């Protein structure tokens, strides 16, 4: 048996495997509108390729629709396997001084932000600071080379800030903490109760919320989450995320979140339950082809 994952479609390999009568499976298939248009422009090839899979398992309904058009014969929508991923518990790598500072603050995080979204978050911070004197806003921009532009916007709002790579400059008056490094986002999620996921107020398509929700965070996002629509729809259904459209709505939602006695473990377990069901159902399908061979 040969298993291909998500969008990893290798034409020559698929055709050669099929010649040997080896079962072909496409797990957690993901086809975006952009990639669908490319495959559909060479429909004779795509129908030959996708038609050779014994079964395909799309991770969402959009992919299901595209697979049908592209010639897949047997399609089973079970769900997105990414729900089944587990977070490994491990301590953060912050210095003792930084950990002490964070523990003294009421923290929320704005992650993967794009141009204009940082200003919206900073305005929200300034308003909320009137009520929460120890408030700290952590901003993790999607592109760290924009840090200089972001600091100018923060200066214009007369807010005190510190840049993560300059840890020694942090002090009790720091209001905005700007992260200019890669690979530490999870560490910041672990110390935050609430996370705003960027690329969603602007028309970028949003960011995958599963990493933050698996760590028990309250999720806030803008209206533009088309890249992960079905995940956000499910989170909304479970009451695990909140959509906002502007700074005023962000302020209101954060205020509610700060005073909400939420159970992060409950959120984590909800996602685990969804993931376990998807994983179990997928395993049973794969097992059928293992035994069949």
Regions found by a protein language model. Give the residues of each.
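Nucleotide-activated sugar donor-binding and catalytic core shared by glycosyltransferases
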Residues: 1-293
């Amino acid at each position: 048996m040969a298993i291909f994952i998500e969008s990893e479609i290798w034409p020559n390999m698929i055709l050669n495997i099929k010649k040997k009568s080896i079962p072909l499976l496409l797990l957690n298939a993901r086809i975006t509108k952009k990639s669908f248009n490319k495959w559909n422009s060479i429909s004779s090839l795509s129908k030959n390729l996708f038609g050779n899979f014994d079964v395909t398992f799309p991770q969402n309904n959009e992919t299901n629709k595209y697979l049908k058009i592209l010639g897949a014969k047997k399609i089973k929508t079970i769900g997105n396997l990414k729900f089944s991923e587990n977070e490994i518990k491990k301590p953060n790598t912050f210095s003792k001084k930084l950990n002490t500072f964070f523990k003294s603050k009421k923290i929320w995080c704005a992650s993967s932000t794009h141009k204009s979204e940082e200003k919206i978050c900073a305005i929200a911070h300034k308003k909320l600071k009137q009520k929460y004197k120890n408030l700290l806003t952590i901003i993790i921009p999607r592109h760290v080379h924009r840090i200089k532009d972001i600091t100018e916007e923060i200066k214009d709002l007369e807010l005190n800030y510190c840049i993560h790579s300059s840890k020694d400059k942090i002090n009790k008056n720091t209001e905005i903490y700007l992260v200019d490094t890669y690979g530490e986002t999870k560490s910041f999620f672990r110390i935050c109760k609430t996370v705003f996921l960027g690329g969603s107020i602007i028309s970028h398509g949003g960011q995958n919320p599963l990493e933050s929700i698996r760590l028990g965070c309250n999720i806030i996002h803008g209206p533009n989450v088309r890249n992960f629509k079905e995940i956000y729809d499910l989170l909304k259904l479970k009451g695990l995320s909140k959509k906002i459209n502007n700074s005023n709505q962000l302020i209101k939602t954060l205020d509610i979140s700060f005073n909400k006695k939420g159970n992060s473990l409950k959120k984590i377990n909800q996602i685990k339950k969804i993931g376990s069901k998807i994983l179990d159902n997928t395993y049973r399908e794969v097992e059928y082809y293992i035994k069949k061979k």
